[in-house]
A protein has these predicted regions:
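Non-transmembrane, aqueous-exposed alpha-helical and coiled segments at domain scale
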Residues: 86, 264, 272, 287-295, ...
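Gly/Thr-rich phosphate-binding beta-strand-loop-beta motif of the actin/hexokinase/Hsp70
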Residues: 1-34, 39, 159-178
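Glycine-rich phosphate-binding loops at beta-strand->alpha-helix junctions
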Residues: 299-319
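Short beta-strand-loop/turn "lid" adjacent to the catalytic site in phosphate-handling enzymes
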Residues: 53-114
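Glycine-rich phosphate-binding/hydrolytic loop that grips phosphoryl groups
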Residues: 12, 274, 278, 331-378
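Phosphate/ATP-binding catalytic cores across multiple sugar-kinase/actin-like superfamilies
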Residues: 73-81, 269-296
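Conserved ATP-utilizing enzyme core subdomain
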Residues: 14-20, 24-33, 38-41, 185-281, ...
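Phosphate-binding/catalytic loop of phosphoryl-transfer enzymes
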Residues: 2, 102-110, 121, 125-211, ...
């Protein structure tokens, strides 16, 4: 079956679309990535999404206009990846505006902006969307949803495999080995903390909006990382939580950056970016160290996807702080780094079609497995 996956992440830089073929057993499907297309958001749309995602209020009419604009951008990306309309089903994550994990006093909730009936009409094909809602209704975090799909797409290795996505947020998947005493362990996954979100916001601020990210890690490479500050930041409450846990720009956005820059004091801009880059790597390394100490899970390799894997300074920091762990881009095993999350949502749509569960209680904390997503057919 040919499926189209659409993903726009917390970086709000645009939409990734992939066309993929799936067949066979849902847990270990035969799959082929046929095309990948990235469609950037217009600058004004990206700016508005980032601001709202950090808590700036907007009237209902403006949010309605924004939902329509986001939906139209999804359709543009879909046509770029599938110009001949070969896909028979579309999986679309939508644009996350706000994510509220569950707490002891309040259920979780998450808002992915999308007008799914409009998208189905624009593309003249059924759309599966709202993937987080069912897991949240079962008491789960609603995210991350990628780990179970990672395990199906990549499969086990000779030891524990880690898959790290460095988008706006750093989220981690751990796939148990194919043999040995830990082969029956569940797939694990959680949001570690900020990946590119704080780095990107700092670059935009320091360049007066001219640079939206640290291309090739050039700014970080020119600065010095303050490890004393990083060690202090690592003691913050979110980084002390055990999984399941999830987060987003509502926690690691402009206000958080403002606080961290204030704590850094009057340092050079390059030093600030170097410290934020080192912080991203340190957050991941701390989680892996705890996993090793608490559960005797030792990774054989760490595959890195998302835009952050194109930042050589960040990759070097990961390699250094993870103390010799083999760190490499997911491209090296045939999983295109920038296409991975869109491929996941193509798979989740196929799973919905097959009635196969897409969440994993060991990852999200939901009370049980369930099929994810809501299907909308063209009128």
């Amino acid at each position: 079956m040919l499926c189209l996956g659409l993903m726009s992440g917390t970086s709000a830089d645009g939409v990734d679309a992939v066309l993929a073929r799936f067949q066979g057993a849902p847990d270990r499907p035969e799959w082929q990535l046929l095309s990948h297309h990235h469609s950037p958001y217009p600058a004004a749309l990206r700016d508005e999404l980032v601001r709202i995602g950090q808590g700036e209020p907007r009237p209902a009419a403006a949010l309605l206009d924004l939902a329509e604009a986001v939906t139209e951008q999804q359709a543009i990306a879909a046509r770029g990846a599938d110009p001949d309309q070969r896909a028979s089903l579309i999986g679309c994550h939508g644009q996350t505006l706000w994510h509220r994990p569950p707490s002891s006093t309040r259920r979780g909730a998450s808002w992915q902006l999308l007008q799914a009936p409009l998208l189905a009409q624009l593309l003249v094909r059924p759309v599966v969307h709202d993937f987080r809602a069912a897991d949240l209704a079962l008491g789960g975090q609603g995210a991350p949803l990628v780990p179970r799909a990672d395990a199906a797409l990549i499969g086990p290795g000779d030891g524990w495999r880690g898959v790290l996505n460095l988008g706006g947020i750093a989220n981690l998947t751990l796939i148990p080995p194919r043999w040995g005493p830990q082969k029956q362990e569940p797939v694990l996954g959680w949001d570690c903390g900020p990946a590119n979100s704080l780095i990107d916001l700092a670059m935009e601020q320091f360049s007066d909006g001219q640079q939206l990210f640290d291309r090739d890690g050039a700014m970080a490479a020119a600065g010095r990382c303050d490890n004393d500050v990083i060690q202090r930041w690592l003691q913050e409450p979110y980084f002390q939580l055990s999984p399941p846990k999830s987060t987003g720009r509502e926690c690691f956005g402009q206000e958080d950056l403002r606080r961290r820059l204030h704590e850094l004091g009057s340092v050079e801009r390059a030093d600030a970016v170097a410290t934020l880059t080192g912080f991203t790597a340190a957050v991941v390394a701390q989680d892996l160290d705890r996993l090793s100490a608490d559960r005797s899970i030792h990774l054989l390799e760490l595959l890195v996807a998302g835009g952050g894997c194109r930042n050589p300074v960040l990759m070097s920091e990961l390699q250094r702080r993870c103390r010799g762990l083999a760190v490499r881009a997911s491209d090296q095993i045939g999983l295109a780094a920038e296409a991975r999350e869109a491929l996941v949502f193509a798979l989740l749509a196929w799973w919905h079609h097959r009635g196969h569960p897409g969440n994993a209680p060991a990852i999200t904390g939901a009370t049980r497995e369930t099929c994810l997503g809501v299907r909308v057919d063209p009128a």
